[in-house]
Amino acid sequence: MKAKKNAQICFISSDTRDLYAEDIFRVMAAPESYIIKFRYRYELIKEVNRIKENMDVIIYSLVGTHSDENKLELIPIRKAKIKDIEKQNDFIEYYLELKEFVILTSENKKIECEKIPQKIVSIITDKNLEVEPCLWEEKVEELFALDNNNFRDRLMYKIEKLEVRKFCERWKNVPLKGKNTYVCYSNSDYKLIINLKKSSDKKSSDKNYILNINCDKDILKDILEFISLDAPRDKVTNRFYTGYFNTDQRYSQLIFRNPPQKSEVENSNKYDFKINIKLKKRKFYSILFGLLIGILTAVTKYNGIITFSKVWNKSIPEIIDYSFLPLIIGLISVFLFHKYDKK
C-alpha cells in the first residue's frame, strides 16, 4: 500500500537523550548527499510496511521534552530519501540520503502539541506539516531561537564542500551500510570548506566557540586541528594534501567535534560527526613509468641492441618483434612499480 500523494514521512529525533540530539547535529553538519543511519525498535514505527526504499522523508527535531509538555515544538530540519532499509530481529535500520534544509511554510508557523506524531517514524497527512526549502543559515537561526534546548550553547557548522584542487577530480560518496566514504589519491591537494555560525545572544557574545578536527596526520596533512570562531559567522577554507604511502589503498577519518561552552559539565557529549576517507595510490605515475620503459625498450631494440630474432635465429613477424616485446615489458614495469613503489 502506497502513501498518499500529500502524505509526509516523518523521522523525529527528540532532545530527551544526547544520542538523539546528536542526530540533529549530524544532520545539520553533513554535506549534500551524505548517508545517515537511523536505528529504531519496531514499536516506535507507525505502519512500518508502508515505508519503502526511495521514498522521500523529512527529519524533524522535537525540542522541549525536558520541560512542560505544552511547550513541545516540532521543528523540520532537512529532507532526505530512503536509500536502504535493513530489517533485523528487534530493530530496523534506515539509511537516508540527505537533501535540502526546510522550514514550515509561512501559513504554518508552529505545530500544535496535539498534532505532534506519537511515533518516532510516522506517515501523516496534516497540512500543518507542509514545508518549503530554506538556507542552512536560516535553519540555524531557528534552532538558536528555541527555548529549553542546548543548540544555543554550541557552535553550529556544516561541511559545505570537499573538493579537489588538481586534476579536476571530485570526491565520490559511496553509501555502503551508512558509511560515507570519500575517495582521494596520494600526493594530491584538496580543499575543505566549512560554514560556521554561533548564537547572536548577548550571553554568548563573549564565549569562545571551537570546532575540533581530528584525523591521521601522517595521511592527511595540514588539516586544521581546531577552528575558533569569534565573529557571529564565518566560512573557513582549509587546504590540505595527501602524502605517499606504501599500500594500494588506506583508510582514514575526519572527525568533527563541537564541545559545549559550559566547561563545568564534565564528560559532556561532544557530538561527533565523522567522514570516512579512502586513499588510493595514483596509477598515473606507474603508467608513465611503464610507458617510458616501453619506449626505451623499443628504441634500443630498433637500434639493434636487443634483437631476440637474431639470438634465437627465428623468423618473427616484424610487427610483433618490434611492438609486442616493448608492450609486455611496459605492462610488467607498470605492475612492479605500482606494487612495490615505497614512496
PLM feature segments, named:
Residues M1-E43, K177-Y182, N187-K191:
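N-terminal "first-domain core" detector
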Residues I329-K343:
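Membrane-helix interfacial anchor on the cytosolic side
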Residues W312-I328:
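Hydrophobic alpha-helical transmembrane segments
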Residues E93-G178:
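Contiguous surface segments at macromolecular interaction interfaces
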Residues F25-I111:
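Structured alpha/beta reader/binder surfaces that contact nucleic acids or chromatin modification marks
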Residues D248, I255-I306:
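Cytosolic-side membrane-insertion boundary helix
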Residues K166-S200, D206-N212:
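Contiguous beta-strand segments within globular domains
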